[in-house]
Amino acid sequence: VFFDGIVVHVRGADAKVSPHTIYVALGIDLEGKKELLGLWIAKTEGAKFWLGCLTDLRNRGLEDIFICCVDGLAGFPEAIRTAYPQARVQLCLVHLVRAALRYVATKDAKAVAADLKKIYTSPTVASAEEQLEEFAKVWDAKYPTISKQWKSKWTDMISMFDFPEEIRRATYTTNAIESLNSAIRKFTKNRKQYPSEHSALKLVYMAIREASKRWTRPIKHWKQALNHFAILFPDRMPKDYQA
């Protein structure tokens, strides 16, 4: 399950416009197909808000999650571990790289992105740590914040190394959530603000519904990943599942 947020501007009852975030839960089912699981809107969030979202998913029938890919949102990993104790939490690589590049001059962006890629495409945790240290040696003089942030989030970044390459390719490096965000932005780009939270949710839902018409095939590398899931989590697969 991928969790992500889109910022919108909503006019309140007092006629003041304020930023809200619409949070999207995008699931990959056992057939490897994308599915919208939930939409929520809020001005602020924290562990209590996230636990409410996850409880909503559980009450609507989402029994188990193998992997949760999330942005570095405060309180979210803890809420996931409360609602779905067996789920593995992984910080979204797309967001980590994007956040890092905010600090980088345009002329350095390509080289920095390439060196960051060496970290998250490493075959093991040990080699990833070596690449992170190498990154720090090369770039800390100009951009010390990047390696500092990655080191502070390292625990929730490295769970992917517990899985074989097939699962990593199908999940952590997929552009599923990024392509959905692009579709939403394209659909909503001409709206500067919304008269209510409901209207904002409605337009984002319509954008996702339009995008979902193309969700007819499994994501890349899914068959190989699913076979590994069946081996790693035999007791958590549906009883009628056949590889």
Named regions from a protein language model:
Residues V1-A13, I22, C69, Q90-L93, ...:
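Conserved, well-ordered core segments of regulatory domains
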Residues V1-V70, A74, E78, A83-Q86, ...:
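RNase H-like nuclease fold core
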Residues D4, A25, K34, C68, ...:
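Mobile genetic element proteins and their domesticated derivatives, centered on retroelements
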Residues V17, A42-G46, C68, V89-C92, ...:
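A generic short alpha-helical patch detector that favors 3-5-residue windows
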Residues L30, I41-T44, W50, R58-N59, ...:
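A detector of single, family-specific signature residues
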Residues A42, N59, R81, P85, ...:
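Amphipathic alpha-helical interaction elements
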Residues I67-A74, A79-D115:
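Conserved beta-strand -> loop -> alpha-helix junction used to position metal-binding or nucleic-acid-contacting
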Residues K118-A243:
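Acidic/histidine-rich catalytic cores and adjacent linkers
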